[in-house]
Curated annotation (Swiss-Prot):
Pathway: One-carbon metabolism; tetrahydrofolate interconversion. Plant MTHFRs strongly prefer NADH over NADPH. Not inhibited by methionine or S-adenosylmethionine. Gene3D superfamilies: 3.20.20.220. This is Methylenetetrahydrofolate reductase (NADH) 1. Substrate binds at D113, Q193, Y285. One of its GO terms (molecular function) is methylenetetrahydrofolate reductase (NADH) activity. Homodimer. Pfam families: MTHFR, MTHFR_C. It comes from the Eukaryota. FAD binds at T52, W53, H81, R111, G112, D113, Y153, H157, P158, D159, V160, D175, K182. It comes from Arabidopsis thaliana (Mouse-ear cress). SUPFAM superfamilies: FAD-linked oxidoreductase. It catalyses: (6S)-5-methyl-5,6,7,8-tetrahydrofolate + NAD(+) = (6R)-5,10-methylene-5,6,7,8-tetrahydrofolate + NADH + H(+).
Length: 592
């Protein structure tokens, strides 16, 4: 979806749109750390995020890779910067074709900074001289597919700012006229260069309107987190620093925490003034850190850490090809990135109902599904690599996870448990102690308000429902006992399969069971989570392989603990259990 349309949708609901900018880190570890920060920031619901291109086009390939993961794995509407620096038309078109094929629809068109080692911008042979040329090219070749954003400079472009820190009136007006040419050529959004004097920004907006620039103008807000970094960035951009800001920072310039706290306060006051003058969007330059951006938005009342809203129980895709997707199997609830990877080859995605046409189309397992950031790998090492002398030791690790003592799980990409798990974590702890090793669960919910903490989704005004669900590993003996007991509970349905594909079930192999649904005003019933036997058979290969790839392999090859985990993998069953009585059922009764 185009960013300008998303901003319009948000502001028409009387809300303030906000967004975040990131840049490509220099190291592989830095990239993985960035994705973890992105995940946290995206949970607050930004309208979009953007990723920079890098000075002189130096990070082109990495920017393309990060942009694709942002759109398709982090699931946030992504805008990619694209510059003219060192970019002949062939490379520009390659970049545009790449992001289009990855479902990205938004570009920030820039001239770019001079190449490394040069003071002035130099047009590369076969390339463009300015952002206007780039806008014209994108519109000419790609029509209306891309949303095009351009940069606005409240104090004029740094190239025309004089030694005294000011642009001449003629240079300023010329800069405005050039901005209008970019908009007239097809740009539909303006994001500004950083500034610290809000009066300058407000004058800039008014001046734009006076000459017929009517598209949204989004202020770029750069939080101050480090004094030297602040001076360096302001100097590079030739940004005016108000006297009161200098006076406030000078006494605390050597105290980074004090500078950061004041930076949050100052940016908050800037934003309050901007919003009070009718501006409805904010763009935060994060510098790849999250605390200042979160602090500003919390001060403004735009986010509340205790009330993070969800449009669905899982993060809605941003890829233009998946925007209508609203149904998924519950099995990947804790591994959404793996699910996206295994379904990226689909031409159509379930909308409204699951149907039975997709089960055979999952991609095969690859190393990607088991790759982990080093930070998460370290956490698993710390929490899960202990001597395992018996199955009781294995059960104890699962119990610790369920009662909240562990923050990682080999079977989850998430940090800690889902918030709703706290409702049933005591019961989960008991059944894990008894040999039912849970990896996925949800409590029953009957007509809870859709904005309820922990279990709500879909926004206010609706009601949500859930059937209780448990997914666990257990021995054949325990499965046999469970099957026998379940005969006294007609509302319970189950499926079980082992690594050798021995199948036990009391449901039909084509029976799809909706286990989460919501009812909202003037809408059809939404059922975003289902249990599907065909998908369960696909998931079981991944679930069993995790015993080896994500846990046993953390031990030395000849370690007895590793041998025990492999024995569990090869002998246990994976079980999916649903209590279809969501009104007064008790899924844990069958374990009594």
């Amino acid at each position: 979806m185009k960013v300008v349309d998303k901003i319009k949708s948000v502001t028409e609901q009387g809300q303030t749109a906000f967004s975040f900018e990131f840049f490509p880190p220099k190291t592989e570890d830095g990239v993985e750390n960035l994705f973890e920060r992105m995940d946290r920031l995206v949970s607050y619901g930004p309208t979009f995020c953007d990723i920079t291109w890098g000075a002189g086009g130096s990070t082109a390939d990495l920017t393309l890779e990060i942009a694709s993961r942002m759109q398709n794995v982090i699931c946030v509407e992504t805008m990619m910067h694209l510059t003219c620096t060192n970019m002949p038309i062939e490379k520009i078109d390659h970049a545009l074709e790449t992001i289009r094929s990855n479902g990205i629809q938004n570009v920030l068109a820039l001239r770019g900074d001079p190449p490394h080692g040069q003071d002035k911008f130099v047009q590369v042979e076969g390339g463009f001289a300015c952002a206007l040329d780039l806008v014209n090219h994108i519109r000419s070749k790609y029509g209306d597919y891309f949303g095009i954003t351009v940069a606005g400079y409240p104090e004029a472009h740094p190239d025309v700012i004089e030694a005294d820190g000011l642009a001449t009136p003629e240079s300023y007006q010329s800069d405005l006229a050039y901005l209008k040419k970019k908009v007239d050529a097809g740009a539909d959004l303006i994001v500004t260069q950083l500034f610290y004097d809000t009066d300058i920004f407000l004058k800039f907006v008014n001046d734009c309107r006076q000459i017929g620039i009517n598209c949204p103008i989004v202020p770029g807000i750069m939080p101050i987190s480090n004094y030297k970094g602040f001076l360096r960035m302001a100097g590079f951009c030739k940004t005016k620093i108000p006297a009161e800001l200098t006076a406030a920072l000078e006494p605390i310039k050597d105290n980074d925490e004090a500078v950061k706290a004041y930076g949050i306060h100052f940016a908050t006051e800037m934003c309050k003034k901007i919003l009070a003058h009718g501006i409805t969007s904010l763009h935060l330059y994060t510098l790849n850190v999250d605390k200042s951006a979160i602090g500003i938005l919390m001060n403004l009342g735009l986010i509340d850490e205790s009330k993070i809203s969800r449009s669905l129980p899982w993060r809605r895709p941003a890829n233009v090809f998946r925007t209508k997707e609203d149904v998924r199997p519950i099995f990947w609830a804790n591994r959404p990135k793996s699910y996206i990877s295994r379904t990226k080859g689909w031409n159509d995605f379930p909308h409204g109902r699951w149907g039975d046409s997709h089960s055979a189309a999952y991609s095969t397992l690859s190393d990607y599904q088991f790759a982990r950031p080093k930070g998460r790998d370290k956490k698993l090492q710390q929490e899960w690599v202990v001597p395992l002398k018996s199955i009781e030791d294995v059960q104890e690790k699962f119990k610790e996870l369920c009662i909240g003592n562990l923050k990682s799980s080999p079977w989850s990409e998430l940090d800690g448990l889902q918030p709703e798990t706290k409702i049933i974590n005591e019961q989960l702890g008991k059944i894990n102690s008894n040999g039912f090793l849970t990896i996925n669960s949800q409590p029953s919910v009957n007509a809870a308000k859709s904005d309820s903490p922990a279990i709500g989704w879909g926004g206010p005004g609706g009601y949500v429902y859930q059937k209780a669900y448990l997914e666990f590993f257990c021995s054949k003996d325990k499965l046999d006992t469970l099957v026998e007991k379940s005969k006294a509970f007609p509302s319970i349905t189950y499926m079980a399969v082992n690594k050798s594909e021995n199948w036990v079930s009391n449901t039909g192999e084509s029976d799809v069971n909706a286990v989460t649904w919501g009812v909202f005003p003037a809408k059809e019933v939404i059922q975003p989570t289902i249990v599907d036997p065909a998908s369960f058979k696909v998931w079981k290969d991944e679930a069993f392989e995790i015993w080896s790839r994500s846990w046993a392999n953390l031990y030395p090859e000849d370690d007895p603990s590793r041998k025990l985990l492999e024995e569990v993998k090869n002998s246990y069953y994976l079980v999916s259990l649903v209590d279809n009585n969501y009104i007064n059922g008790d899924i844990f009764s069958v374990f009594a």
